[in-house]
């Protein structure tokens, strides 16, 4: 059992710490579309395939508009009571922290690579990612901004809210001001949708995906190994059933070496009232397997 490894898909481990308002924490980032249009993309190896990903660090360094724009959106969100994670600060913390690593290593030396984007989400622990896209329109001496805001659940990457529009033409040359003017009239509705999604999580649990893998060096142990007449995968599925909100989960696929669960609803708080992250849920499963099966 000690060689089983649990992976949380979209490996991000937000910890929920709520004040009385119980509002989700947000992190505003430039959208993939904006990064691609402005040349701030890079490539990372994902299971042997090179995939494009946004290069936020390079964008913040080289684009003088990006930081003021994000700061202005952060201000609008803060005015409505949302706790915020600062993109620039989180990136600096990752780069300066020698403990940060690009890989998760098991006790047996096997590794599961973690992308730079996953590291950022792990570090920031934001409940919702707000992606921002904007373009500047020129009409004679006046300028306006067309924008799109997308709220994404940080675990599932599902879009939960969107807002788009174009501000009134203005003589001002300051991009953050133009953007704020364009966004402000739609911000309350956008924030209401973010809050509605989070309220659903409070009632019905956080949706995550859970993957279980058996390392190649696991010897004779796999998910078909029997303990007291039950296969290991049956034992795992029973535990997931008992520990999800209203037993809501879906075993999408499984074999003797892997199990893929999706639509897994985990509680936001444990039995002691402490905030529960996806990593806590996975560790509880690991503890259960070690304690239950070591004596069988």
Language model: regions and residue ranges:
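Sec/Tat signal peptide C-region and signal peptidase I cleavage site
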Residues: 15-19
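Conserved small/polar residues in nucleotide/adenosyl-binding loops
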Residues: 294-296
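Sec-dependent N-terminal signal peptides
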Residues: 4-13
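Extracytoplasmic
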Residues: 21-23, 64, 68, 72, ...
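N-terminal segment of the mature soluble domain
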Residues: 42-123, 129, 229-290
């Amino acid at each position: 059992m000690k060689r089983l490894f649990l992976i949380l898909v979209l490996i991000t481990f937000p910890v929920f710490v709520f004040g009385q308002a119980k509002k989700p924490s947000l992190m505003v980032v430039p959208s993939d579309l904006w990064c691609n249009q402005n040349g701030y993309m890079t490539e990372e190896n994902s299971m042997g395939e090179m995939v494009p990903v946004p290069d936020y660090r390079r964008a913040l360094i080289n684009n003088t508009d990006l930081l003021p724009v994000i700061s202005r959106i952060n201000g609008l969100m803060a005015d409505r009571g949302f706790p915020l994670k600062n993109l620039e600060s989180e990136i600096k913390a990752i780069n300066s922290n020698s403990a940060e690593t690009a890989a998760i290593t098991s006790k047996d030396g096997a590794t599961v690579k973690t992308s730079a984007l996953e590291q950022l989400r792990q570090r920031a622990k934001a409940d919702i990612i707000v992606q921002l896209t904007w373009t500047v329109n020129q009409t004679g001496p006046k300028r306006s901004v067309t924008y799109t805001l997308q709220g994404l659940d940080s675990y599932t990457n599902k879009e939960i809210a969107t807002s788009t529009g174009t501000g009134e033409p203005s003589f001002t040359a300051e991009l953050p001001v133009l953007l704020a003017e364009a966004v402000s009239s739609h911000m309350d509705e956008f924030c209401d949708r973010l809050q509605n999604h989070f309220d659903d999580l409070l009632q019905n649990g956080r949706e995550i995906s859970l993957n279980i893998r058996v390392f190649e060096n696991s010897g004779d142990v796999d998910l078909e190994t029997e303990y007291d007449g039950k296969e290991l995968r049956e034992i795992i599925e029973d535990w997931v059933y008992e520990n999800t909100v209203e037993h809501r989960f879906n075993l999408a696929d499984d074999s003797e070496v892997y199990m893929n669960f999706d639509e897994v609803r985990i509680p936001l708080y444990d039995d002691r009232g402490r905030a529960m992250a996806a990593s806590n849920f996975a560790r509880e499963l690991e503890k259960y397997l070690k304690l239950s099966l070591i004596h069988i």
